[in-house]
């Protein structure tokens, strides 16, 4: 839905907004963006920050000093959604004494709630779903004209028109596919992010070439279900397969000069193919790190979740990855206490975590979400069970992660320096190819100083469950 509310109420056609040129008026105010949730939201926030800066806004030093406050929201868990309402309440009270404040809610909560948000928080100026991130300037033009705007209609996502204001100068998110066509029974994403929309390989490569020209060294290709990339694009090869797949995209962008590392997330076991695994092995820039959610280690629970694969298939994927890339890191997402999950089924999840030996696990207790089948089921588990199972899982995850990291003690790992350690300014921090957070001294042998963007060989001398520390060696590859 797209509505623009004034006095009297007026309905503004979506097509008019999409085709009218955006305003060129320059704003002198400041903005603040608070991002909740996934990497897709972070990438959307970077694009919206770029749009605001192109409009003449500048970033405020603090949220309570901003003339425009934008919350890019997440609805994947109830606690994230409630946090948003807490922030909004504070800003709504502020607006009563600062009437020129613009208050914007973007992202998945905006898409889910739509006009209901205006009824709950009438101080809002703009409610916009994630498909409208690139339309921010045109939407704010309506706000400048004194209207309250709700933009939650299912739209084709415009190609990026404004340079994103990146939070990093080293590593960049690159959206390659938006939306999700899966129908997992617990997940609200398809209803708030819409159907899959793949960007063209040419547009993606052009963006990456621009990033390389600006000095970026690492890119992460993003999608809610990135292995589905290209399903909506035309073209069939002589062999009868789709012409545009994630595997083809990796080959298409691999030779962009200046980009040293390529990652991608998030994968779905249902679409993670042998051909993709072999491409990751063959292409030297693709990092040996794979984020593949398994959600549950029990086949009956997976069936209830409508995930479309079995534990056996997941094992085959992991085994093949490690057959070709023995040191590859595998991270995952897990949900415990799904409706009806028994003690034995939960134990199957624990068993799989230990068997696979995950390097990192994003854990969560099941949270009923609006407009999802699982939220309506009668076999919901009590909160005390959720808390206890999550506690058990987290303890196991930390133990397994420490075991995995212990293998690196004494080894030399190549680290891409991303910035200064905020707790120890004399240190830099970065990540290995396997995505391990690593800290090391900014000054190396023979008074050599390292900078963000350098690729530094670091000898690991201390390991923790979720980070490594070490000493720089002589070898380094400068960013410049």
Curated annotation (Swiss-Prot):
Protein name in the entry: tRNA-2-methylthio-N(6)-dimethylallyladenosine synthase
Chain ranges of the TRAM domain: 406-474
Pfam families recorded: Radical_SAM, TRAM, UPF0004
Oligomer status and interactors: Monomer.
Lineage of producing organism: Bacteria, Bacillati, Cyanobacteriota, Cyanophyceae, Synechococcales
Radical SAM core domain: residues covered: 166-403
The keyword Cytoplasm is assigned to this record: yes
Stored InterPro entries: Elp3/MiaA/NifB-like_rSAM (IPR006638), Methylthiotransferase (IPR005839), Methylthiotransferase_CS (IPR020612), Methylthiotransferase_N (IPR013848), Methylthiotransferase_N_sf (IPR038135), MiaB_methiolase (IPR006463), rSAM (IPR007197), rSAM_horseshoe (IPR023404)
PROSITE patterns linked to this entry: MTTASE_N, MTTASE_RADICAL, RADICAL_SAM, TRAM
Gene3D superfamilies: Methylthiotransferase, N-terminal domain (3.40.50.12160), tm_1862 like domain (3.80.30.20)
Occurrences of domain MTTase N-terminal (ranges): 29-145
Function text: Catalyzes the methylthiolation of N6-(dimethylallyl)adenosine (i(6)A), leading to the formation of 2-methylthio-N6-(dimethylallyl)adenosine (ms(2)i(6)A) at position 37 in tRNAs that read codons beginning with uridine.
Similarity field: Belongs to the methylthiotransferase family. MiaB subfamily.
Gene it is expressed from: miaB
EC number: 2.8.4.3
């Amino acid at each position: 839905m797209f509505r623009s509310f004034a006095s009297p109420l007026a309905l503004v056609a979506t097509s008019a907004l999409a085709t009218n040129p955006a305003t060129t008026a320059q704003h002198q105010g400041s903005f603040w963006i608070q991002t909740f949730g996934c990497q897709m939201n972070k990438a959307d926030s970077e694009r919206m920050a770029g749009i605001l800066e192109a409009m003449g806004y500048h970033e405020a030093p603090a949220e309570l000093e901003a003339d425009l406050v934008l919350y890019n929201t997440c609805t994947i868990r109830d606690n994230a959604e409630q946090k948003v309402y807490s922030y909004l309440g504070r800003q709504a009270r502020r607006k009563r004494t600062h009437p020129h404040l613009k208050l914007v809610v973007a992202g998945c909560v905006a898409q889910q709630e739509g006009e209901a948000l205006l009824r709950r928080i009438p101080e809002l100026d703009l409610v916009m779903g994630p498909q409208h991130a690139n339309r921010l300037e045109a939407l704010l033009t309506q706000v400048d004209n004194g209207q309250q705007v709700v933009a939650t209609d299912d739209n084709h996502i415009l190609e990026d028109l404004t340079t994103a204001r990146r939070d990093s100068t080293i590593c960049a998110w690159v959206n390659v596919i938006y939306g999700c066509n899966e129908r997992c029974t617990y997940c609200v994403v398809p209803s708030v992010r819409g159907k899959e929309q793949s960007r063209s390989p040419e547009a993606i490569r052009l963006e990456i070439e621009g990033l390389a020209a600006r000095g970026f060294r690492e890119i992460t290709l993003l999608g809610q279900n990135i292995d589905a990339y290209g399903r909506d694009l035309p073209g069939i090869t002589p062999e009868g397969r789709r012409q545009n797949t994630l595997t083809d995209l990796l080959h298409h962008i691999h030779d962009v000069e200046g980009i040293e590392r390529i990652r991608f997330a998030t994968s779905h076991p249902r679409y993670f193919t042998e051909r993709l695994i072999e491409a990751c092995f063959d292409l030297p820039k693709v990092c040996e790190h794979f984020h593949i959610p398994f959600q549950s280690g029990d086949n009956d629970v997976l069936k209830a979740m409508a995930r479309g694969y079995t534990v056996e298939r997941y094992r085959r994927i992991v085994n093949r990855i490690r057959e070709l890339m023995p040191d590859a890191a595998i991270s995952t997402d897990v949900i415990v206490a799904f409706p009806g999950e028994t003690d034995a089924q939960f134990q199957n999840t624990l068993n799989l975590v230990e068997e696979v030996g995950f390097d990192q696990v994003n854990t969560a207790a099941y949270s009923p979400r609006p407009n999802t089948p699982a939220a309506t089921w009668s076999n919901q588990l009590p909160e005390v069970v959720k808390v206890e199972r999550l506690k058990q899982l987290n303890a196991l995850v930390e133990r397994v992660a420490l075991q995995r990291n212990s293998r690196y003690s004494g080894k030399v790992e190549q680290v891409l320096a991303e910035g200064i350690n905020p707790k120890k300014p004399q240190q830099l921090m970065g990540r290995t190819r396997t995505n391990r957070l690593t800290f090391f001294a900014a000054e190396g042998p023979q008074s050599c100083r390292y900078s963000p963007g350098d690729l530094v060989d670091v000898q690991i001398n201390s390991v923790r469950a979720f980070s490594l520390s070490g000493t720089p060696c002589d070898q380094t590859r400068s960013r410049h």
